[in-house]
């Protein structure tokens, strides 16, 4: 089984959209998937129609809840909902070994799944550190602009001490360009070339697949759905299908 953290320290790069599409696409291929929402914005939890009476990721991290009690079900797989109180996680998690809280909790259920996907906040915090400590690999969504790629480079600086101190086996699956409008402009082509160079510096790759800009992604979220069910014939759905196939082929 594989635990994948989807992260970028820059906001607006499509982390939640990518996690949701991965969850749906892998589920449709017959894989058993668990998603963990660690973002205090709770967007993934909202899309998955989380129940408010169940324990959340916060309870898992503080030890106040059993992970099996926190697992909810959706049409595209199981998930653990976020909590807005996770914004205080750096203060709430103040015990020795706080970096390992999520890893320890997932150890109790990981045998039940083929993939566990972790959606993270757009910031370096104890939440992101827990996600990186618990996972096998990392997918970095990035939009085609220079600031997003700077976020990728900052993330790489975070992963190095994680690899040294809390998770020696972690590796970066690759950088995924999202909200892409094509190579028609010199700027987009330049940013794509920069993304390739950034990937090489991180000893990883730029995925061959790019996720194009499409209103269907936001529409699917507004309908509390996923791109595969909402717009199965859309070009962006084909993009996500190709991305998932590329990811699985690298296994």
Locations of regions flagged by a protein language model:
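P-loop NTP-binding core
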Residues: 1-251
